[in-house]
């Protein structure tokens, strides 16, 4: 992703242009110069000049989706996989509004994105009217007010003379500090106006008080230079003194572009590694330091390792509720918690209590840690704790022997285990939320180089197909396929993008978990409302099509399985099929997510949540006590 130094070089290149150009062409050229290569769009009259310019610009490839939500989700997935920001182009009114869900997902998960929306001409903007009206222009919507809480920067361009300044500011903010989406809303008469780029004022982050490449004005205690080195040395000293330290890396590792240095750091530290939710692909299952996946729907070994630790080093993970549960007071209760984050408020939010908050960027902190580890020798107690945690990994697998006894339907945990046995290293696997994500994160045995992700913060249904599209366009030309794990409920939310996959010739292998509805809410209703179901399947108002006929209609190869004995055949046929293919698995509706954190309702109606080490189905108390007995 482009940063400050690259930005200054690109900024200089545009100043040589003296000819008058259409503003829309200027925007397209500038984002291409900044490093944007793909634009995900749905055309519309309010954005017609932007559509035309983005379709003409050298160095830009436009990808047409059938819904603006899908375009935004595809752009998010593209940036997540490639490390390169994408653009989204939508029209005014409903076009912009439709994109909000995907933009929100990028905001929560810290993914850079620039949205370029069309808008009605300036004279018909409602805020220019002499009286207060709901709408003045045709299809007008005051989109920037709607998106300000889910973007880092959102503005309606009011003068052609401001375009360079606003565009440069938007691009800088999207990738600086904690990345996220930005939004430029451009009225149609401004899109078509002629400008002289050399006469336009630019954006200077230092002159505006941003101070340095990453920090936002007023942020707490930003560490650089000697202060950062001292902090790294202090962390190393604390780890050396600990007996049961755990390293919890999050998605911030890849966002910061320090994946390879992180692996070096982990090896030098030699302590247990328990990746956070959605960062499970940072280390393969056979990594010698990997002890499990902690979280509310993680595994027992990962949660035992974290809950019994005496030091927890959190790098690039914001410790959200899905990670630490609603019983956040009971999270890693005996651990000294050290957290490094680029976004200062995350260090001080009310759901966590951090002993050593470090406000720094992982781009500089990880190298500082590696430097501080020169000559370091890990205490023998650290290896003892890793061995202890590894033994619990072996003792408490996610896929239990009794799951294989299922008849007439497929157990999703068993299917996922078989699928990942068949997948190759370096595969890219995108997930929907709910069953497709929860079961996969628990049961998948990842190989070196595999990428596995969903959107975690928004966790919206409908992410699977758009994410597949975005991932494919981020993959190298040598890629032969992209794997999509979808749910029957989720896939319906952006059903139309099946045609986008077929139309663009994307060799997507879609594994469709069919549990006759919304299994996550079904489990909730069964647990808290005596089995009374509302809106979670065919028996409570939500119906689904025959997906075999759907596959045929769109032109997908199709296979199905409802027996364990047939799973390997179905997986092999799908992976070997030329082009796009769907494998539908009819899975056991009686299989709940397990293990998982459980809550119970008290007599006064309030809820109480069990701690992370005490997952449902609950272990016998004596077994739990023994499992948590740590080495001296």
Could you tell me what each predicted segment is?
Residues 2-19, 161, 209-215, 338-433, ...:
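Phosphate/pyrophosphate-binding active-site segments
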Residues 2-376, 422-425, 479, 507-510, ...:
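N-terminal alpha/beta PP-like core and its mobile active-site loop of ThDP/TPP-dependent enzymes
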Residues 24-27, 32-35, 42-45, 50-54, ...:
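Active-site diphosphate/adenylate-binding microenvironment
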Residues 44, 229, 256, 263, ...:
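Conserved structured core elements
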Residues 116, 124-138, 296, 350, ...:
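Thiamine diphosphate
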Residues 145-147, 391-397, 549-551:
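Short, basic/glycine-rich phosphate-binding loops at helix/coil junctions
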Residues 183, 339, 431, 485-486:
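Generic enzyme active-site microenvironment
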Residues 251-252, 317-318, 434, 487-489, ...:
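Active-site metal-binding loops of divalent metal-dependent hydrolases
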